[in-house]
Amino acid sequence: MEKKNYIVAIDLGSSNVVVAVAERDAEGRPVVRSIVSKPSQGVKAGMITNIEQVSNSIKAAVETVGEELGIRITEAYTGISGDFVRCARHTDHVFTSDPQNGVNRTDVEALFDRMRNVQAPDDETIMERIPQNYLVDENQEVADPVGSFGKRLASTFNFILCAKTPIERLNLALRRLGIRSLGMYANALVTGAAVLSADEKEEGAAVVNIGGGVTDVAVYYRNVPRYIATIPMGAGAINNDIRTLGILERHVDSLKRKFGSAVAELAPENKMVSVKGRTAKETKDILLHNLAVVIESRARDIAEYVAQEIRDSGFGDKLAYGIVLTGGS
């Protein structure tokens, strides 16, 4: 792989693994050349449970991209998601070096150094440190403190933490394929950066990504990621509920996508649909209203967890743009 030209991203989910390859144009901007999605196995709610299955899943997607573009992938950026990813805030301060001439970059860097010295618990690693605000002399809140007058500079940082075990397992799967991880990022943050507009990030929005095994939530306000969380429940839970209607697993997803509704009162009361059974001649009739009732029940569960996470963020009343939904489920 030509390192200077290609950028590779691998997103391992509970139901699919996606590999995206971009190439830098003459001005250095990334242009997507290929996106491949393959079913994944060996992942439950974001946690790798079977290294052999995961390696094979990633290999299938990587090889497809490689054949399509005529390259061999040896390094990639990766995303990670699960309830083992969380955020925590920490506040610290420094005294400015030259109060008469205002806060300078050296003061800001000194504050960053203090934040870089903050240690994670033994079983976690810090993925990112994101400044939330700056406070000069405890009463002047500013987005950029350089030039402000004061003796004391404080800030609250949002630390993005991840348990070490899932990181180690994902890196192991990549190493088995001869792929070096260039960096690992929380999917909730990546989704927010990719999906939300500049206005949504500035005025406040929560992006909710409903995946197969998990639902990621990220809250943005004043162009800063304020909070992230992962709910260990996604479209897979809805699919499992639909199976209780007597539907074979291989028909569940297509039934949901073609006839499903998350609002039962909008589904026709008496309309039925026939679903294939275990043999070519066997069918099962399902009331669309009953299908919608099952979907709505689980969708409400997910929505309630999302609402609680937004409340826990402390920014629920500041989201002018509300909630932005995304995901392939």
PLM features: residue spans?
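Feature representing long, continuous alpha-helical segments
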Residues: N240, H289, V293, S297-E304, ...
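Ser/Thr-centric signal marking residues that sit
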Residues: S14, V214-T215, T326
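Glycine-rich phosphate-binding loop of actin/hexokinase-like ATP-binding domains
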Residues: E203-L245
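Nucleotide/phosphate-binding catalytic cleft detector across ATP-hydrolyzing
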Residues: M1-N16, A20-V207, V224-R226, A235, ...
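Core structural elements
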Residues: I80-D83, G212, G327-G328
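Nucleotide-binding motor/catalytic cores of P-loop/tubulin-like NTPases across gene-expression machines
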Residues: D317, V324-S329
